[in-house]
Amino acid sequence: MARAQWLRAAVLGANDGLVSVASLMIGIGAVNENNKAMLVSGLAGLVAGACSMAIGEFVSVYAQYDIEVTQIERDGDIDGADAAAAREKLPSPTQAAFASALAFAIGGLLPLLTSGFIKPWGPRVGVVCAASSVGLAGFGAAGGYLGGANMVRSGTRVLLGGWLAMLITYAVLRLFATIFHGMNISSSA
């Protein structure tokens, strides 16, 4: 049971990394056609997202750990050896943080590595979308499998959700670029 929960969390973390980094790269691509801008924004999103996921997971798991340790200590009918064994079974906040950061980074690497070094703007954005679509469908199907749900339905749901996130990010930043056209935000300087 615990293994399935870790695997499911890893799939969700990888999906989050993929959607976040791909959406960020596509959003930057909406306002700046420079390949370096997309690459740097994707890398920044990957690092920031992995750190954020790790810190959030560490805090969350540590809070749960503290609650469970306090409960173990309150239970007077557990002797010292049983209490120590119960503590050892609790999840490690450090391991959870590392796993969360790693999962996010793995997902975020997909759009970054498949498109970050393509110079022409159109093919670069197309590769981000295509690689991300394959990853989203795969992560969704894997999540469905691990959760005992229909893999096709789960893969489709994750794919559509990812497309929606990328579309909204592109549209909002494109609108921003149109409104603030005089600010010259798409220069490569």
From Swiss-Prot:
Protein family membership: Belongs to the CCC1 family.
Annotated transmembrane regions: 11-31, 39-59, 98-118, 125-145, 160-180
Pfam family membership, one: VIT1
Domain of life from the UniProt record: Eukaryota
Main location: membrane
Protein task: Probable vacuolar iron transporter that may be involved in the regulation of iron distribution throughout the plant.
InterPro entries: Ccc1_fam (IPR008217)
Key words, A-Z: Ion transport, Iron, Iron transport, Membrane, Transmembrane, Transmembrane helix, Transport, Vacuole
GO cellular component: membrane; vacuolar membrane
Presence of the UniProt keyword Lyase in the record: no
Protein name, per record: Vacuolar iron transporter homolog 2
Recorded topology in the membrane: Multi-pass membrane protein
Substrates-to-products reaction catalysed: Fe(2+)(in) = Fe(2+)(out)
GO biological process entries: intracellular manganese ion homeostasis
Ranges in the topological domain labelled Cytoplasmic: 1-10, 60-97, 146-159
Regions of this protein lying in the Vacuolar compartment: 32-38, 119-124, 181-189
GO molecular function, one term: manganese ion transmembrane transporter activity
Entry's localization field: Vacuole membrane
